[in-house]
Amino acid sequence: RARRAVEKAIHLLEEPDDHYLLFATRLGLIKKTALSEYVRINRNGKYALRFKIEGDSLVNVRSATNEHDIVMISTTGYASRFSCGDIRASGRVSGGVYGIKVGDRKGSGGGIVAGMVAMLSADEYILTISKYGMAKRSRLGTAEKIHDTDASGAPKFEDDGSPKMVTDGYRRTKPGAKGVRTMKLDEEHHDSIISVRTIPDIEDHLFLLTKSGMMIRIRVSQTKETSGKSTRGTRVM
């Protein structure tokens, strides 16, 4: 029997109606199954998904409704945002569909999936942390076009005098897209995103641990909030 390891533990709702489990794999697949299919599990367990691609593995599992926005982020710094309702629900033993292009697929940004988050509020933050200790905090946003402003809050205008418009937060894409750049990485030193988290409260604390066993504790507010998708963020470790 193949060796098994626990990947994720989540709590089940007493009333799972309208809730789903979302499974994200390292090669960019996402699978959505009704949470009710997992309410009764025997001691030997149940198959939750079948991997379509040899060598693929599970990265993350989230509980969500069709009202949630899903964001999948690759290790190379790209983010694919789409509605949970855009993904068709399937049975337990299905393999899912592509949520983001990664690896050597044509038009991809390379890498593998670093993480997946499910979010309800446009004012929640996504925190991305890189292998070499850079962190970036970005607001999810409404994905609508808004009037761009400078650091002082003054509106910006194009050369022809028309308002300069930008996307509020992360732009929505279709499932399976390459996505948009979410964090600029030091490619010369082969930096990559290793952790993706939602931040409901910027006064929360982060505990960062290195492979050598060194741990530091910082407030989320110590990370810099950035609206630009091509910025590196701040060094936290």
Where are these regions (language model features)?
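Short, structured "edge-of-domain" segments at secondary-structure transitions
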Residues: 1-237
